[in-house]
Swiss-Prot record:
This is ATP-dependent zinc metalloprotease FTSH 11, chloroplastic/mitochondrial. It comes from Arabidopsis thaliana. GO terms for molecular function: ATP binding; ATP hydrolysis activity; ATP-dependent peptidase activity; metal ion binding; metalloendopeptidase activity. In the N-terminal section; belongs to the AAA ATPase family. In the C-terminal section; belongs to the peptidase M41 family. It is found in: Mitochondrion inner membrane; Plastid, Chloroplast thylakoid membrane. PANTHER family: ATP-DEPENDENT ZINC METALLOPROTEASE YME1L1, METALLOPROTEASE M41 FTSH. Probable ATP-dependent zinc metallopeptidase. Involved in the assembly and/or stability of the complexes I and V. Involved in thermotolerance but not in high light stress resistance or in the assembly/stability of the complexes I and V of the mitochondrial oxidative phosphorylation system.
Length: 806
């Protein structure tokens, strides 16, 4: 038998036990469970324990059945004899054995250290051999065999002790190290992780729990089973069980759910919900800043000051940049009298302005009275001595008022062209801007420039932008108005400067501005009458080729209520229509088209309207026309159409035969009846269930007209001749509403009775509208009335429509 074989057979490596890790934790590291270098000193302590316990190996006797005759350990030439006596069987004395025990040391469990033990035993035998020079080589070999057999049996008995179960053995250590290395190298290999956990569970179940809960490795069902087994072995499962004393709920279902996810390879979710397990507590930190009220107030004050300073700096820098930019354009930074800045007024002088851009009184038509007064002002400027020799003074201000489009600005342009003096003009909205004080400064600049060129005229268009009644919340506008009041009639007299202004809303102007001394003359520019409309049409048609059928007087009579702007638009639309059609001259048909477009709106020929809707619209408009033809005081019909125009599906237009300055009660009641004609016709022909929303605008107009008659004109017997304010008492408002409803119901009944009497004419006119779509007044009369009766009815209607209420 070889030496290595003998060593392998004698060296016992018992399995590790769990208690060894509990008793001697210093021998193992927490991560890899490898043996520490401190184990060597522990081995020395074990050796001293064995020595103190007087451990001695049992005597070894060699018998024939123990040693073969052909053994390598028995020399062939020796005179060894096998005997049965006790003395002959005793190979080593007690003294020699004690000396060998004293020199014996345990160094380790590795094979290299066992070789060291052989060397120590050999040294002991050599010392014994020196003492007994007579012993032979054969006895030394037998002594070694007996010694190793005794050591083997002693180690087997010692290893059975629990407190020595920590003995490190290289084979199991290397196996664990190999499994740990492979598992760490492949964290997503569930098979390797399961094998490692199973091996650790045999020796260190606490390590299984720790490794599993680190969540750094993928596990399968085997790993989960090993984890549960470790929890049971270490009694860590009690952390997830309910506790009736403390009221702790059971977290075992959450644990099992988590293990189910872990078995599927999910490592992202938390192991257990925070706050359920003691290992995963829910940490709550209470923050209670100990800041006094004074400190908090100081902090808020400092932050507010810093924010205010920052905003102020940004505002100042922005204003400076804007001022610099405007100054570079000739604005605020470079203002001054005579400069090209926005403060400098615009001057219009006939000597420096081309003649084509200047209007004269020859271009002003339809307002002879206003033009006459302005001609007197121009004459005063041209020849002041003619008026001053009798003590007359130049008027300081002239205010032009009137409806939009009547020619107020045109009159100012005519004065600029007629007068031989400088003409300064500004719009009311040009005074004010984003900076406070700009308006007042521009007013001063305007009058300073005018003083240097007196006598002159200053014209302010739309003066209500700055001259309206002063209000508390419009401080910047008040400053501009105050400066204007001072310049017009203040402490310093401005001789030779006439201020002209135009506005559509004279009622909202400040009384201080409209008083004598500032605006001495108030000139109203009304809408033109028939003669004025004829003059305006001749002016705009001048220079345009016209056909022989154009009757300017007829157009003027057929456009009551048109102002100068409307007539200019009419001629322009007709000219465009003629150009589109390729006509060489303007015809009456084109002028009539322009008139209808202004009065009735643009035709919508492409709009799809169903036959039922057309039929309903035809009867609706026929009801209006029948009532207008058979009601005293109603305006003559201009046209009736079911062609969609603007937002309406059809309409009946009426134009007064003469210019109206006031309206009688009969005419107002006739308007109410005409408004009700469409709704009553729908009800009579189609029934109450088929009336439509087409009459909503008619009812709205009728209600407003009845309200106006009762509350403003005093045309109600129950209310009396009283003008009701905007906010009457509740009792008065109830009485007004009752009278309005009464007027509307009476009109409804009158129209219903009238249409029942003329139902045949209603059907005839509706069928004609369905066939022709548009009918003029002559067409309607020719269809419904005989020729003589139609002429007689027209004369009677015009007589009844004359003015009866001044």
């Amino acid at each position: 038998m070889s030496s290595s074989t003998l060593q392998a057979s004698l060296f016992l490596r018992p399995p590790l036990h769990t208690s060894s890790f509990k008793l001697y934790p210093c021998l193992f590291s927490s991560s890899s469970l490898s043996f520490c270098p401190q184990s060597l000193s522990s081995f020395y302590r074990l050796s001293s324990v064995l020595h103190n316990s007087r451990f001695r190996p049992l005597p070894c006797s060699l018998r024939q059945d123990n040693v073969a005759s052909d053994s390598d350990f028995i020399p062939k030439d020796s005179a060894f004899e096998v005997t049965d006596s006790a003395e002959s069987n005793r190979l080593v004395s007690d003294t020699e054995v004690s000396e060998l025990e004293t020199n014996d040391r345990f160094v380790g469990g590795e094979e290299t250290k066992s070789g060291g033990e052989e060397a120590e035993v050999s040294n002991g035998v050599t010392e014994g051999k020196e003492e007994d020079q007579k012993k032979s080589k054969f006895r030394i070999v037998v002594l070694m065999m007996a010694l190793w057999a005794a050591i083997k049996r002693a180690i087997e008995k010692v290893m059975e002790w629990e407190w020595l179960s920590w003995w490190p053995f290289s084979r199991q250590e290397k196996r664990l190290e190999k499994l740990i290395a492979e598992a760490d190298a492949n964290p997503k290999d569930a098979a390797l992780q399961g094998a490692l956990l199973a091996e650790l569970n045999k020796h260190i179940p606490e390590a299984v729990v720790q490794r599993f809960e680190q969540r750094e490795h993928t596990v399968d069902s085997r790993g989960v089973a090993e984890y549960i087994r470790a929890l049971v072995i270490t009694n860590a499962i009690s952390e997830y069980l309910p506790d009736e004393q403390t009221g702790k709920p059971s977290s075992l279902p959450a644990l099992l759910q988590e293990l189910k996810h872990r078995a599927s390879g999910n490592m992202d979710e938390s192991f257990v919900n925070p706050g359920i397990s003691e290992k995963q507590p829910l940490h709550v930190t209470m923050v209670n800043p100990k800041v006094s009220n004074k400190s908090r107030f100081a902090q808020e004050l400092v932050s507010t000051i810093l924010f205010t300073v920052a905003v102020g700096l940004v505002w100042i820098m922005g204003a400076a940049a804007l001022q610099k930019y405007i100054g570079s354009l000739g604005g605020i930074g470079t203002s001054g009298v005579g400069s090209s800045s926005s403060y400098s007024p615009k001057e219009l002088n006939k000597e420096i302005t081309p003649e084509k851009n200047v209007k004269t009184f020859k271009d002003v038509k339809g307002c002879d009275d206003a033009k006459q007064e302005l001609e007197e002002v121009v004459e005063y400027l041209k020849n002041p001595s003619k008026f001053t020799r009798l003590g007359g003074k130049l008027p300081k201000g002239i205010l032009l008022t009137g409806a939009p489009g009547t020619g107020k600005t045109l009159l100012a342009k005519a004065i600029a062209g007629e007068a031989g003096v400088p003409f300064f003009y500004r719009a009311g909205s040009e005074f004010e801007e984003m900076f406070v004080g700009v308006g007042a400064r521009r007013v001063r600049s305007l009058f300073q420039a005018a003083k240097k060129k007196a006598p002159c005229i200053i014209f302010i268009d739309e003066i209500d932008a700055v001259g309206s009644t002063r209000k508390q919340w419009e401080g910047h506008t008040k400053k501009t108005l105050h400066q204007l009041l001072v310049e017009m009639d203040g402490f310093e007299q401005n001789e030779g400067i006439i201020v002209m202004a135009a506005t559509n809303l004279p009622d909202i102007l400040d009384p201080a501005l409209t008083r004598p001394g500032r605006f001495d003359r108030h000139i109203v520019v009304p809408s033109p009458d028939v003669r004025g409309r004829e003059e305006i049409l001749e002016l705009y048609l001048q220079g345009k080729p016209m056909s022989e059928d154009v009757d300017v007087k007829a157009i003027a009579r057929g456009t009551p209520g048109f102002n100068g702007a409307d007539l200019a638009n009419l001629v322009n639309i007709a000219a465009i229509k003629a150009a589109v059609e390729g006509a060489e001259k303007l015809s009456s048909e084109q002028l009539e088209f322009a008139k209808d477009r202004i009065v009735m709106g643009t035709e919508r020929k492409t709009m799809f309207v169903s036959e039922d809707s057309k039929k309903l619209t035809a009867y609706h408009e026929s009801g209006h026309a029948i009532v207008a033809l058979n009601t005293k005081g109603a305006h003559p019909i201009h046209k009736a159409t079911i062609m969609p125009r603007g937002s309406a599906l059809g309409m009946v237009t009426q134009l007064p035969s003469n210019d109206e300055t006031s309206v009688s009660k009969r005419q107002l009641l006739a308007r109410l009846d005409v408004c009700m004609g469409g709704r009553v016709a729908e009800e009579l022909i189609f029934g109450l269930d088929h009336i439509t929303t087409g009459a909503s605008s008619d009812l709205s107009q009728a209600t407003e007209l009845a309200q106006y008659m009762v509350s403003s004109c005093g045309m109600s017997e129950a209310i009396g001749p009283v003008h009701i304010k905007e906010r009457p008492s509740s009792d008065m408002q109830s009485r007004i509403d009752a009278e309005v409803v009464k007027l509307l119901r009476e009109a409804y009944e009158r129209v219903k009775s009238l249409l029942k009497r003329h139902e045949k004419q209603l059907h005839t006119l509706a069928n004609a509208l369905l066939e022709y779509e548009t009918l003029t007044a002559e067409d309607i009369k020719r269809i419904l009335l005989p020729k003589q009766e139609g002429e007689k009815f027209e004369e009677q209607q015009q007589e009844e429509g004359d003015l009866v209420l001044a």
